[in-house]
C-alpha cells in the first residue's frame, strides 16, 4: 500500500513538473513527421500491462499513411492519458480509435463503450485537478489537462463528447498550419 502511494505521488510530481514547464514555455517539443497509426500503436503498446490487467483491448485500424508533425513522445503521452481514461471507465471493454485527414487538420478519435461523461462534468473535464463524479479511485485529475496542454502546444485542440448510444469520445484535431 505504501509503495502504491509513493508511486502515485511520484507520478503526481512528474505531471506537475511537466505542466509547469508547459506553462512557462520551457518544455521543448521535438517535432517530426510521424504516422498517426504509429502514434496510436506505440501509445497502446506502452499501456499493454494495464490493458492486460483490466482485460481491455484496443482497436486501431490501419487506414493508410497519414502523417502529422508532432513531438512523438509527448503526443504519445497525451494519447496514453486519453486511452487510460477510456480503460478506467470501461474495464474489460474495447477502446476504439479512428482517424482521418483533410487539408486543414488531422482528426483522431478515441472512444470507449462505457457510460459516457456526465452532463455536469463536461465543462470541467480538461481542468487541472478536476475529478468527475465517476472518477477512477486512484486518479489525481491531471491526465486530461496534461493531454490538452500538450496538444495545444502543437497547434491542436481536444474536446470530449458522448457517443450516440453509449461511450465517451475524445476528438483531437491537429491543424496543418
Identify the role of each PLM range:
Residues 93, 156-157:
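Conserved glycine-rich
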Amino acid at each position: 500500500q505504501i509503495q502504491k502511494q509513493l508511486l502515485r505521488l511520484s507520478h503526481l510530481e512528474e505531471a506537475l513538473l511537466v505542466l509547469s514547464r508547459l506553462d512557462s514555455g520551457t518544455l521543448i517539443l521535438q517535432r517530426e513527421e510521424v504516422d498517426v497509426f504509429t502514434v496510436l500503436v506505440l501509445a497502446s503498446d506502452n499501456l499493454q500491462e494495464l490493458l492486460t490487467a483490466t482485460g481491455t483491448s484496443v482497436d486501431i485500424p490501419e487506414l493508410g499513411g497519414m502523417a502529422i508533425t508532432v513531438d512523438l513522445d509527448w503526443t504519445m503521452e497525451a494519447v496514453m492519458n486519453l486511452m487510460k481514461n477510456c480503460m478506467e471507465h470501461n474495464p474489460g471493454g474495447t477502446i476504439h480509435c479512428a482517424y482521418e485527414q483533410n487539408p486543414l487538420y488531422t482528426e483522431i478519435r478515441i472512444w470507449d463503450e462505457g457510460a459516457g461523461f456526465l452532463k455536469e462534468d463536461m465543462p470541467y473535464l480538461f481542468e487541472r485537478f478536476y475529478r468527475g463524479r465517476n472518477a477512477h479511485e486512484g486518479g489525481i485529475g491531471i491526465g486530461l489537462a496534461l493531454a490538452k496542454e500538450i496538444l495545444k502546444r502543437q497547434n491542436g485542440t481536444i474536446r470530449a463528447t458522448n457517443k450516440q448510444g453509449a461511450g465517451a469520445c475524445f476528438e483531437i484535431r491537429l491543424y496543418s498550419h
